[in-house]
Amino acid sequence: MAYKDLLNCKIITAFITPFHEDGSINFGAIPDLIEHLLAHHTDGILLAGTTAESPTLTHDEELELFAAVQKVVKGRVPLIAGVGTNETRDSIEFVKEVDAFGGFAAGLAIVPYYNKPSQEGMYQHFKAIADASNLPIIIYNIPGRVVVEMTPETMLRLAEHPNIIGVKECTSLANMAYLIEHRPEEFLIYTGEDGDAFHAMNLGADGVISVASHTNGDEMFEMLDAIEHNDIKKAAAIQRKFIPKVNALFSYPSPAPVKAVLNYLGFAAGPTRLPLVPAPEEDAKRIIKVVVDGDYQATKETVKGVLRPDY
């Protein structure tokens, strides 16, 4: 059922956590943010992921966040819960708690960071999480943040587990192509990099788990819709204008730039929690000009070349 629930989700937004200036969660800001996303082509929502600043959230805060979002969404789109840490026992206990909490199509579990496990260690970690509950698991492979990379061979080995239903892949397009070619049936493959969405979807990926959809969901939708209708020239033209905006959104550690843009647009995204800090004021102004207005001069002043965001 979870696979079918997520199959038509092309744009899954990795939701920010809005904070007050004192660092507490701003639950009052959630309804407007959610309605904004749903009005601009978000098909699903990931909670308590990297963009949500999950390393700074307690499990109790995450559960409060889950309840608040579920109350607003009311089943209109599938929800995914961030459930993984770098400690297997903690991940097992939390995935059981989230499964009992209910209301989620799947849980997202990150490759363990800091401990630097081997491929066999990664396999055993995810197998233990997937065995622990009935909540379907999506693996999050993001070597830019966790230092180690799960190989396609290990990923495909885990893809045979009946309770592991997909991956958020942030490695290379070559790896993505291999996974798409060799995956079993009913295994979802998402790119986790906004800038790669054009290429990933043309390779046959199922969708994108996105940060840029907070601010540029319409452009993302138009590009993916053009790909679906085999209008590659139109999709490529959108991609060329979209890339500078993605670069701007990752010119400082995420989610600082997207929060700056959301605050400018009138959504109370608030600050980041330490150790993340907001983008400097002048740079934030340039980021806003790029993301909101497509300002080419601001693009040149804000970012150089093409960034590969490790989010």
From Swiss-Prot:
What Enzyme Commission number(s) apply to this enzyme? Answer: 4.3.3.7
What broad class of enzyme is this?
A: lyase
Q: Which reaction does it catalyse?
A: L-aspartate 4-semialdehyde + pyruvate = (2S,4S)-4-hydroxy-2,3,4,5-tetrahydrodipicolinate + H2O + H(+)
Query: Could you tell me the Gene Ontology terms of the biological process aspect for this record?
Result: diaminopimelate biosynthetic process; lysine biosynthetic process via diaminopimelate
User: Per its record, what are the GO molecular function terms?
Assistant: 4-hydroxy-tetrahydrodipicolinate synthase activity
Query: Which pathway does the record list?
Result: Amino-acid biosynthesis; L-lysine biosynthesis via DAP pathway; (S)-tetrahydrodipicolinate from L-aspartate: step 3/4
Q: Which SMART domains match?
A: DHDPS
Can you list the disulfide-bonded cysteine pairs? none
- Residue numbers binding pyruvate: T51, I209
Q: How does it assemble?
A: Homotetramer; dimer of dimers.
UniProt protein name: 4-hydroxy-tetrahydrodipicolinate synthase
**The encoding gene:** dapA
